Amino acid sequence: MSLIATRLQNWRVENPELDRNMTRPCEYGALDFFIEQTNAGNSILSPKLRERAFASIGNTVQVPVINYDGDVTVSNVRTCVIPDDENTSALYTVVWATYSVGFTMVPTLYMNNEISYDHDFNRKMEKVCRAFANSLDQAAVAALEAGKTKVLKDKLNYKFAANVIEVPTQMATEIMGDINPIMRANCYPGLVHVVGNAGIDSLIKKLAQHGIYNDVNKRMEYENKVFHYTNNVVNEASKNGTFFAVEDGNVGVLTRVDREALNRTRANFHEWDVVRLPYIDLPVGSHYYTAVGDQSQTAGAASADMTCNVKEYFGFSADVAFVIAYNGNPITVANPIIKAQIAARAENVPLGMPVYVTNAGEFPAGGASA
């Protein structure tokens, strides 16, 4: 005789917070930077352009611009006849890329499942939003990469190769302070934003250890900048940190949605709208509809009986364009973006602050320890 047949089974207690890290977002610093600059008072994208571009699906968006003129003549004599000095115009074409994500839900699937509808919906929404944001962040980094300056009026004592400042390990603690003079020499003296990765975050924290009351005050290296961090700025081999320095007010992002979303159409059980998704502070198009069909293969034995059931469809999409301030002659005219990368030091070797001996002549050969 035994009670084994009626022994309590495993206790299952729904607790959605336990798996929260399975859809955790990263930091999308490049995307956040473009969005912030779009909404700034000195944005390169006017409200009119944003509004017209948002409704431009099916059309090409072009912006009239005037090219740089480096041939202005300054005379040393007065004349009764003032010469012409005409500008040259061009059309800047906005380049769009389409992004689309979606998922489905079968409402009655949860009648015999420990996972609730809300738990499953929330995790699906979180993971598609995370993927959407990550793709946009990667595109923002690619835009910075493509827009980095080819011209440095004064590179100070850094090596400038392949349009990148190569920072030796010994100068890692100096580059943040030197970026401002380099930008100023390129005629960009404004506030600098830094879009960097974990290596740059580490560097800033090390500089912060040497503050106003420490041996050397390194606050001026970084305190006049705005930092944005993302894992999508990737180090090349033998590099320990990579960043883009960008003058304030020189980038932005445009979006547009499909025609039905723009019109908020409702037809044949389909619904379109314009929404803002978590992690992405941009307007995107949404599409929702339901259908009836065989759902028996959705969850194996748990859905084997579901041969005619309702299924919900959730879709989100947008065309996105990352915009850099126009430059019709990037070979001659500097762009407001500088890329720099810091050489890696050996593993388990700390980053040391340089020590300069100004009275070396007072010590005998062999140095101060002799």
Regions found by a protein language model. Give the residues of each.
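Assembly/oligomerization interface modules of large self-assembling protein complexes
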Residues: 29-101
